[in-house]
Design a protein with these regions (language model features):
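Glycine/small-residue-rich loop that forms an oxyanion/phosphate-binding "nest" at active or ligand-binding sites
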Residues: 117, 123
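A charged helix-plus-loop insertion that forms the helical arch/lid used to bind
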Residues: 84-98
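Short, flexible active-site-adjacent loop segments at beta-strand->alpha-helix junctions, enriched
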Residues: 76-78, 91, 122, 147-150, ...
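Hydrophobic, well-structured mid-protein blocks that either form specific transmembrane helices
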Residues: 152-172
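Adenylate-forming
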Residues: 124-131, 151-154
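ATP-binding/phosphotransfer module of carbohydrate and carboxylate kinases, centering on a glycine-rich
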Residues: 1-69, 79-84, 105-116, 128-142, ...
Length: 286
């Protein structure tokens, strides 16, 4: 019969929903992507929690009656074991700091007694792409998600590597850059929006505007310059760029590749399905 996992991927601006269906004794999986919803991550706690609960209900609708669990990929810092947000000073989710999301979602959604398990969003994206996307068939894949923040995941044979010589891979975004701030602030899509003087909601249009081409290419160069020593440090065989900004890869990707050097750089191939697959795999099929 297999298992059906309802999944949602929670980012700083939007929630992606869907379901992953695993067949017993088979490595194959089927992914169904559901509706996307706004996160409202800069609103008061009640608004944010109601938005997350709406995402849960949407994912459960996609999964249907035979659902056996709920997997949530979520940005961080986040305590995935206890389901508690630790986000402060990262431009999102400030008002749900310290809240037990499992309990809050049981109160506000129809999840009832189903098991709820959390995974880091970058690890979910990286695992999905390593299993069936741009990193499939490559031993060591460094996935960088470029969205409201900057996420990082290193996989070895599609399994996350948490530490390199004692350094937590997920903390890459906290490293300082030569451009006056942490990578999370400077090299994320939020950082580019600040350079362009636009709101996040208007970033896609601004990136596509030819008048901004030089700044967008320079952003790719900066990201590649930052990542080049990381690729060597992590012994990555390919770099995959995911997150909301990956849709504009054609605008910044060549400059990024030039700055990184010989190791190939690819845009994520699975779109919203990647983190959904990865989250279900990490939480219910480890």
């Amino acid at each position: 019969m297999g298992r059906v996992i309802a999944v949602m991927d929670v980012g700083g601006t939007s929630i992606k929903t869907g379901a992953v269906r695993f067949d017993d004794g088979d490595d194959d999986s089927r992914i169904e992507v559901g509706p996307g919803l706004p996160t409202n991550s800069n609103e008061a706690a009640d608004v944010v929690l109601d938005s997350l609960a709406a995402g849960v209900d949407a994912a459960l609708d996609v999964a249907g009656r035979n659902v056996t669990g709920l997997a949530i990929a979520i940005c961080g810092p986040f305590d995935v074991d206890n389901g508690i947000s630790q986000m402060q000073g990262v431009h999102k989710f400030e008002d749900i700091f310290g809240i037990d999301l499992r309990a809050a979602l049981r109160e506000r959604s129809t999840v009832s007694g189903l098991p709820i398990r959390f995974a880091r969003d970058a690890e979910s994206a990286g695992t999905g792409e390593a299993l069936a996307g741009a990193g499939a068939g490559v031993d060591r894949v460094l996935t960088i998600t470029v969205g409201t923040g900057l996420g990082s995941c290193l996989t070895d044979h599609a399994r996350p590597v948490e530490f390199i010589d004692g350094f937590g891979v997920e903390h890459l975004a906290m490293r300082e850059t030569p451009w006056g701030g942490r990578a999370d602030d400077v090299l994320s899509a939020h950082g580019l929006a600040e350079r362009l003087g636009v709101d996040m909601a208007d970033l896609r249009a601004a990136v596509e505007d030819p008048a901004n081409a030089d700044i967008v290419r320079d952003h790719g160069t900066r990201l590649g310059t930052f990542l080049a020593p990381v690729v060597a440090e992590f012994d990555a065989h390919v770099v995959v760029i995911g997150g909301g900004f990956s849709g504009s890869f054609g605008r910044f990707g060549p400059a990024l590749q030039s700055a990184i050097g010989a190791v190939p750089v690819r845009p994520a191939a699975l779109g919203p399905a990647g983190p959904l697959l990865g989250a279900a795999q990490l939480t219910f099929r480890p």
